């Protein structure tokens, strides 16, 4: 569940009324596992931006970053925007988050999530993290770089990852990162 300007009890009750099973997740008092739905966009709390699906391991990144209110944060490789939205939520309507990604398609995914969230201190921008812009030097209070990933962090949910990875793909990924 989002925290800023969202009543968790209302979000949870709404999901349960729709037949969604809601169970507390470990580590964070606002993290929940949800199941028992057929189509996530039909879940009212998702549609209204009260919740943002994200793996708990990804949510812990926002906790570790712990942005101060009023901060300017840049999230590189941000699609689909879960970590960026989490940072914006933690800023409690202050500061701003610039969610970047390399392709316009990914930026549009981020924008869809921003629009649904209703948060106004976040925007998406197409920008390649490999190209240094002198205007970016020493302007951000926080830079989140979840560089192009292997997906190993969520392998428990996406077991096909281990079958698609090859030694050559791993070597290429290491060089890119």
Where are these regions (language model features)?
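S-adenosylmethionine
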Residues: 1-177
């Amino acid at each position: 569940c989002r925290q800023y300007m969202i009543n968790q009890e209302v979000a949870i009750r709404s999901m349960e009324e729709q037949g969604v099973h809601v169970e507390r997740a470990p580590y964070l008092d606002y993290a929940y596992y949800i199941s028992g739905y057929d189509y996530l966009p039909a879940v009212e709390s998702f549609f209204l931006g009260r919740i943002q699906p994200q793996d708990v391991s990804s949510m812990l990144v926002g906790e570790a970053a712990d942005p101060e209110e009023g901060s300017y944060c840049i999230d590189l490789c941000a699609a689909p925007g879960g970590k960026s939205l989490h940072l914006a939520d933690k800023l409690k309507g202050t500061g701003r988050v610039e969610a970047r990604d390399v392709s316009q398609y990914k930026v549009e995914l981020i924008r869809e999530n921003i629009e649904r969230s209703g948060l106004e201190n976040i925007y998406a921008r197409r920008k390649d993290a490999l190209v240094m812009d002198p205007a970016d030097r020493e302007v951000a209070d926080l830079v989140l770089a979840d560089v192009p990933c292997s997906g190993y962090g969520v392998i428990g949910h996406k077991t096909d990852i281990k079958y698609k990875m090859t030694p050559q793909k791993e070597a290429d990924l290491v060089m890119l990162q």
